[in-house]
């Protein structure tokens, strides 16, 4: 018993940190949507795989279809990317989804994700919406994604000092 007590006391002096990593896939594949990367408009490629330090993230809590034409609550952890990542000349095309909805044929909407590193945790989520007022160093997350990264939830408001990297999913 004394050994166990001493062991616990010794462990309490050791620095401990825990980290987690989660990667969420897009709701649909290009095969399911019939969108083609080769025919899509492109404004995001110049930003891919370039970490942005000192970034911030916020959250939104509304449903519906986002700027890509996809349901913004599917998957439940997702992101709205900066309006500067979207090509204003991108065309809306009919998809192969069962409801034949129109989708934005823009690379930012086709298997593109944002990876956020914050307080030792890493979350990678698909971009399925646009945050017009956000700069490239600001990502607007679904509430569930925000809460996964920031345990303080909505009381934090704007989470700061994140590293943001736009990547292929």
Ranges and model annotations:
Residues 16-169:
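Secreted/periplasmic proteins
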Residues 1-20:
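Cleavable N-terminal signal peptides of Sec/SRP-targeted secreted and luminal proteins
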């Amino acid at each position: 018993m004394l050994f166990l007590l001493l062991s616990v006391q010794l462990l309490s002096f050791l620095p401990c940190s825990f980290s987690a990593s989660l990667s969420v896939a897009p709701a649909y594949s290009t095969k399911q949507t019939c969108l083609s990367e080769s025919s899509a408009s492109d404004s995001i490629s110049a930003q891919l795989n370039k970490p942005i330090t000192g970034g911030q993230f916020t959250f939104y809590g509304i449903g519906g279809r986002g700027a890509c034409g996809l349901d913004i609550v599917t998957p439940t952890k997702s992101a709205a990317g900066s309006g500067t990542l979207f090509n204003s000349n991108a065309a809306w095309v009919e998809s192969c989804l069962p409801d034949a909805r129109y989708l934005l044929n823009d690379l930012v909407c086709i298997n593109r994700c944002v990876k956020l590193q914050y307080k030792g945790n890493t979350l990678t989520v698909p971009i399925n919406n646009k945050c017009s007022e956000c700069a490239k160093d600001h990502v607007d997350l679904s509430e569930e994604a925000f809460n996964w990264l920031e345990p303080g939830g909505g009381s934090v408001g704007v989470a700061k000092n994140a590293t943001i990297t736009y990547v292929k999913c």
